[in-house]
Regions:
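Outer-pore turret/helix-boundary of cation channels
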Residues: 55-89
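Cytoplasmic (intracellular) domains, linkers, and terminal tails of multi-pass ion channels
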Residues: 1-53, 68-72, 77, 124-142
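Pore domain of cation channels
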Residues: 10-15, 84-91, 97-141
């Protein structure tokens, strides 16, 4: 259980840093470039933000794999098969709080699932706020 708790804190910190750096990179690099039209900068914001979310989902999927296979902290039931795609699918479903329920955690790994859902909620909210701020900057006609 201590290993799962440590993994939760580690992934929470990593995801926060990844998102912070990506949004900072987008803000400062877009402000300095005149080569991209104003409204097109919003497409870059959306794609960059999605890339950050995808990276975070991938990190959580890898952590599920390691926690299950290396540390034996639980397993998955339901429609789960032993492919990385299943880990990615479950991670994306959890991160976005979609929660179909076709795959479910068993054991100590459940705590990790809750932290991923909370992390996804906060990061998606952060992206929405950032996108709004960038829209107020770039969407209006000059």
């Amino acid at each position: 259980m201590i290993t799962a708790g440590f993994a939760c804190v580690l992934l929470l910190v990593l995801c926060t840093l990844i998102h912070y750096e990506m949004l900072g990179f987008l803000k400062f690099s877009l402000a300095r470039t005149a080569a991209i039209p104003r409204r097109a900068k919003l497409i870059v914001v959306i794609l960059g933000s999605m890339g950050s979310h995808f990276l975070q989902i991938t990190l959580f999927a890898a952590a599920y794999f390691v926690l299950r296979d290396r540390f034996g902290l639980g397993t998955f039931g339901g429609e789960f098969n032993d492919s990385f795609f299943s880990f990615m699918y479950y991670s994306a479903e959890t991160y976005t709080s979609l929660g179909f329920g076709d795959i479910f955690p068993i054991g100590a790994i459940r705590m990790f699932t809750g932290i991923e859902a909370l992390t996804g909620l906060v990061m998606i909210g952060w992206t929405a706020s950032f996108t709004y701020l960038e829209m107020t900057r770039y969407w209006a006609d000059p």
